[in-house]
UniProtKB/Swiss-Prot annotation:
Belongs to the NOP10 family. It comes from the Archaea. Keywords: Ribonucleoprotein, Ribosome biogenesis, rRNA processing. Pfam families: Nop10p. SUPFAM superfamilies: Nop10-like SnoRNP. One of its GO terms (cellular component) is ribonucleoprotein complex. Involved in ribosome biogenesis; more specifically in 18S rRNA pseudouridylation and in cleavage of pre-rRNA. This is Ribosome biogenesis protein Nop10. GO terms for biological process: pseudouridine synthesis; rRNA processing.
């Protein structure tokens, strides 16, 4: 059993479909960690520009 989140209303459920809006719920697991970060350069640039 995995926790799922409705993409339409944002509510969490353990069922396949949301009980409120009957939309198919998706997984809420974060993406797998990889030491080869394809977007790390862009995240650091954004973080640096937001500090200013």
């Amino acid at each position: 059993m995995q926790m799922k989140k409705c993409p339409k209303c944002g509510k969490y459920t353990l069922k396949e479909y949301c009980i409120d809006c009957n939309e198919k719920a998706g997984t809420v697991k974060p993406p797998r960690f990889s030491p080869v970060d394809k977007y790390g350069k862009y995240r650091r640039m954004l973080k640096k520009s937001l500090k200013k």
